[in-house]
């Protein structure tokens, strides 16, 4: 397949599928399943074609408007390819879970596929112009999926989601327009090279002036970029849109929001913010670490107070993504020794693993919530259940594995990323890491409470005939649970492929 534009095919394929789904009516889910299965196959193929040195491969580059710094430029390394695989898996899970879309199924599944295209484009684009187009392409269908198929309070939830994410997009756009005016380039690679040499800040200062309100212009641009990505992750205090959006969206849509879209923010920090604004982020490292720790601890404590399972898992997602932020901001420090370099590599490997593992586990948990809702007429409160391990032992067992993965139990996928993050972060930012352990303890209490209240104790009379998972549900969930176990036992399957990219990234970042 030498010379075949596989990344373009991967990105355009969902758009073709969306058109077909839109015209297919009640058969739209079948079209979406076939389309997403093809996407997963292509994403896995891309994963096998990565350069062994960790550089960006499968490059596709064509001039569009050179005078405006716009070119069609796609490529992937271990980070991008892993996010492609995650996006493909989560989208397939979401489509498979959406068994009860009776209102305009063609439009629903068409929007899901458009969102998938936006995800793939965001993880492969290497030029700001069309990266931003794909970034926004994921926002629009997500808004309508919440607005049209969400719960009773879907209107305010969708509006809040749109306003927050659009505000973040504006911050990104303004910052990059300033960078373009200073450099005449939107290419991430060229801009990263300028930043590594210290020339980017000089060009920005020459073009836009020394700064204002006591800060250099470059620092303000870094703040704008960080704010844009912080909304998407989300990072405290930009997280307030998330609980309503996650709880009001249909569970299959929530799977996409938490499993894939939230990773766009973390990916943006690694692909764009650190390479271009590493020096500025290092200068703001202490307050950023404070916000990361606040994200970890606040997410965990907020989850304790929730009675709605979707809101419990929503705040738990904030907590888990906070560990990614902890690892990222902890490593933003000049290397003073070989030990520091090893700690940076451990933290970054952990962040990338955590992105994948959280996406897989969180999507699975919201899928299980969808199953509970379908069997109880929409109930999803922690106190609405009890003793389900008796009438539904398979569901209890498989959901229990996903819950223990979220808890970070050794032997499951959720443990590995967090372990590597803390292994690296403790030597780079020991105070922040120590405080963040509180988040681990509180998360354990939350997960164990869910297990105890949902699966243990007496079975309420109305749940005595609660149906266990169907054969189809077991077949669909088995690969997901199997992957959790496989990564937990053999994490090197991912680490060995990602580590060259980690080494390559760290070698080019300047703090």
Predicted segment positions?
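Transmembrane helix-loop-helix hairpins at membrane boundaries of multipass inner-membrane proteins
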Residues: 1-6, 20-112, 185-205, 504
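Short, aromatic-rich membrane-interface segments at the entry and exit
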Residues: 7-8, 28-33, 105-106, 129-133, ...
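Central hydrophobic cores of alpha-helical transmembrane segments in multi-pass inner-membrane proteins
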Residues: 8-22, 33-48, 84-98, 115-117, ...
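Hydrophobic alpha-helical transmembrane segments of integral membrane proteins
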Residues: 10-11, 137, 230-233, 239, ...
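Cytoplasmic/organellar membrane-interface segments at the starts of transmembrane helices
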Residues: 13, 193, 249, 378, ...
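Hydrophobic alpha-helical membrane-insertion segments
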Residues: 34-49, 165-178, 441, 479-493
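Membrane-interface helix-loop-helix modules in multi-pass inner-membrane proteins
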Residues: 61-82, 126-134, 138-143, 407, ...
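Hydrophobic transmembrane alpha-helices and their helix-loop junctions in integral membrane proteins
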Residues: 93-99, 117-129, 142-453
């Amino acid at each position: 397949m030498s010379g075949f534009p596989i990344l373009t095919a991967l990105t355009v394929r969902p758009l073709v599928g969306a058109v077909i789904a839109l015209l297919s009516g009640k058969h739209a889910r079948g079209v979406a399943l076939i389309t997403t299965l093809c996407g997963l196959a292509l994403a896995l193929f891309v994963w096998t074609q990565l350069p062994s040195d960790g550089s960006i491969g499968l490059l596709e580059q064509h001039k569009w408007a050179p005078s405006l710094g716009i070119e069609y430029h796609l490529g992937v390394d271990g980070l991008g390819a892993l996010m492609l695989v995650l996006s493909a898996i989560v989208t397939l899970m979401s489509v498979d879970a959406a068994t009860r879309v009776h209102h305009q199924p063609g439009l629903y599944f068409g929007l899901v596929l458009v969102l998938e295209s936006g995800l793939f484009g965001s993880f492969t684009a290497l030029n700001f112009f069309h990266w931003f187009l794909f970034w926004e392409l994921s926002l629009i269908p997500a808004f309508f999926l919440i607005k049209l198929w969400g719960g009773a309070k879907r209107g305010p939830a969708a509006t809040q989601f749109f306003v927050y994410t659009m505000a973040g997009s504006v911050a990104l756009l303004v910052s990059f327009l300033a960078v373009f005016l200073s450099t005449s380039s939107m290419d991430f690679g060229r801009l990263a090279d300028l930043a590594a040499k210290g020339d980017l800040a000089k060009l920005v200062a020459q073009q836009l002036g020394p700064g204002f309100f006591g800060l250099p212009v470059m620092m303000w641009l870094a703040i704008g970029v960080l704010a844009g990505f912080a909304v998407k992750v989300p990072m405290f205090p930009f997280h307030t849109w998330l609980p309503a959006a996650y709880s009001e969206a249909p569970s299959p849509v929530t799977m996409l929001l938490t499993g894939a879209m939230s990773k766009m923010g973390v990916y943006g920090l690694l692909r764009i913010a650190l390479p271009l604004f590493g020096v500025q982020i290092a200068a703001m490292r202490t307050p950023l670490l404070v916000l990361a720790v606040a994200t970890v601890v606040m997410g965990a404590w907020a989850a304790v107070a929730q009675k709605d399972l979707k809101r419990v898992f929503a705040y738990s997602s904030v907590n888990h993504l906070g560990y990614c932020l902890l690892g990222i901001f902890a490593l933003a420090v000049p290397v003073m020794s070989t030990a520091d370099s090893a700690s940076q590599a451990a933290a970054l490997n952990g962040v990338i693993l955590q992105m994948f593992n959280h996406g897989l586990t969180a999507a699975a948990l919201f899928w299980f919530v969808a199953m509970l809702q379908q069997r109880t007429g929409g109930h999803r409160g922690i106190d609405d259940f009890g003793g389900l391990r008796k009438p539904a032992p398979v569901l209890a067992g498989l959901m229990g594995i996903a819950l223990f993965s979220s808890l970070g139990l050794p032997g499951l996928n959720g443990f590995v990323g967090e372990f590597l993050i803390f292994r690296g972060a403790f030597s780079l930012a020991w105070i922040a890491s120590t405080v963040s352990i509180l988040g681990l303890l509180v998360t354990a209490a939350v997960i164990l409470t869910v297990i105890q209240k949902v699966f243990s104790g007496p079975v309420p009379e109305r749940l005595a005939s609660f149906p266990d998972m169907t054969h189809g549900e077991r077949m669909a969930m088995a690969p997901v649970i199997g992957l959790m176990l496989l990564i937990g036992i053999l994490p090197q399957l991912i680490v060995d492929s990602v580590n060259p990219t980690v080494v390559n990234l760290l070698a080019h970042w300047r703090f």
